Amino acid sequence: GAVYNGGRIENVAGNFIGNQSGQDGGTFYNAGTVGSIGGNFLGNHVSRYGGAVYNDDRDQIDNISGNFVGNYAGSGGAIFNRGNIGGISGDFIGNYVSGGTFAYGGAVYNDGNSQTVSRVIDHIRGDFIGNYVAGGYNVAGGAVFNYNNAFIGSITGNFLNNYSRAAGAGNVALGGAVYTAKKMTFAAGEQKTYFMSGNYT
């Protein structure tokens, strides 16, 4: 990808367009601590996790802001989190995960891969539009996938036309907009209401 952090970075700002990695984190792979990442993330991709941003096991990003458009990966089309993220703000449009036996988290994958250590995203503020997962057998979370010992404090925004689709009869597709294994709060914010419309499996 474009940036690898194994120490501490205070702030990263800019637009990230068409970056790629053979494994994880098309624009940013974090294995340390980051104050903030800001900018637009357009058409970045990886073969495994986090088309735009990958946050590694137990590592910290205080804030991510910007729009995520057309990013794709093996899981977590835009963001894949295995650590802690304070907040994410921005719209997620047309991000996706496609192909393979399993496909999870068209826009955001929050992975609690440990049963003893929590992985947390404090809040997400933004709209999720036209994100999807499509795979061969087991797919879930067209926009957001929240799994195992992972927590997302709240999501404020609209979910429009996201989907989860598995190929073939008898295969499993869950959560056209959101799949979560934990309790999650959906908030309206200043607009006083939010919409979930056109999402499907």
Residue ranges and their predicted role:
Residues G1-D24, F28-Y49, V53-Y72, I79-Y104, ...:
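Surface-exposed loop/turn motifs in large extracellular/passenger domains
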